[in-house]
Amino acid sequence: MSDQVIIFDTTLRDGEQALSASLTVKEKLQIAYALERLGVDVIEAGFPVSSPGDFESVRTIAQHIKNSRICGLSRAVAKDIDAAAEALKVAEAFRIHTFISTSTVHVQDKLRRSYDDVVEMGVKAVKHARKYTDDVEFSCEDAGRTPIDNLCRMVEAAINAGANTINIPDTVGYTVPGEFGGIVQTLFNRVPNIDKAIISVHCHDDLGMSVANSIAAVQAGARQVEGTINGIGERAGNCSLEEIAMILKTRSEYLGVHTNLKHDEIHRTSKLVSQLCNMPIQSNKAIVGANAFSHSSGIHQDGMLKNKNTYEIMTPESIGLKNQALNLTSRSGRAAVKSHMDEMGYKEDEYNLDTLYADFVKLADRKGQVFDYDLEALMHFANLRDEDDFYKLNYLSVQSGSVMATTSIKLLCGDEEKCEAAVGNGPVDALYQCIYKLTGYDIVLDKFDLTAKGEGEDGLGQADIIANYKGRKYHGTGLATDIIEASGQALLHVINSIHRADQIAEIKQKKVETV
């Protein structure tokens, strides 16, 4: 029987640090549900002490996710650990992940402590975390550049204090596979109580070595791998979990290990993270890139026609990538829509069937044939909308020629419908001028992207924008068969977020004034 490698996902913590705009609690919960379907063992949901938003995200995810263990990050500081425990206590079982720097440069120049102090702080942190849970992970930050004697000492002390998972991060992506595997092997050889903990690795991709280093560590005895979906993360990113998953599956006989992942959920999870994080996947990315299973060379195509095994070491179906058959039309009922959602693995509490069906009927009337990927796109977009949106687009008309475009709109502002028309340098510019006039918000667009979310001329188009308002970044998404309408929805998504933030700020200010 082969050993299990535990999969620890940090998309919602380390991965989110790379984003231009933070994910909402609702978006994080969507990703957490997808990770649960994928079969991830541990989900690091956030860093609770870092902000009220992160605290609420961790608490909400801990409340809803039942089949993956939820973890919260904390520094080796009592208040951090207390905050993590408070956010996680709604879960049936949870993990606290605490860390401290151990490399010479970090200890001397960042912490400005002696190594004795660092070991003592780490031990105290683990013992404090054990008051809340018997599942404690301890990380030696920048372990890849830590003198091996110091690393062995810290690992032994943390295990003695009660840590049952020891994480060895290559924090700055500095090591190479033989070197990193050697570090893990040395720990097994020199730390006397190493058998009392699972050794984990967390590799960054600054030199493009994160996946290779993680595999080298597994070969040396590590039995937990940390990473993110699509490899997103700070700087050059993290170890790509979809790549780790398929390496361990495809080469399981050679490596002698396995995971509990449901590999046919990989493609869908990757797409969701890409969409919600507004981070497109490069076409030649391993496993999930658009070209990952493409064969354009005549020699390769000839071989594939004769025997797929000539050039295909895994199938598209193994990651859940399959051609969607014609599924639904405007004559399909609610039961049919729900049946397709059930078949795709979505739980009833992940979407509102009434909202989804109403959006489905509108789309089916416009394009006739609705596919599973259309339903998924509609569901994700509906989950981004809030019923209490103050601004809603009721009507849109565009006239565009070779020089300028004219747009007229009707915008519901609370209970009042307002009309506006504007001329712009193209239909989107004209539409945005209308919205700016009616809402009164002065917004700077940092990024504007349009992507196809379906197939054919009548497929759905998605608009994604990053906007700057008073120094804060906001991410907006719009979805429609008309890309102009999608662009308007994306801007209104941002403006409604700003409007809600302004309302919250006003309430807080009134509370301060009444004290």
UniProtKB/Swiss-Prot annotation:
GO terms for molecular function: 2-isopropylmalate synthase activity; acetyl-CoA C-acetyltransferase activity; manganese ion binding. The keyword GTP-binding does not apply. This is 2-isopropylmalate synthase. It is found in: Cytoplasm. Its main location: cytoplasm. GO terms for cellular component: cytosol. It comes from the Bacteria. Its EC number is 2.3.3.13.
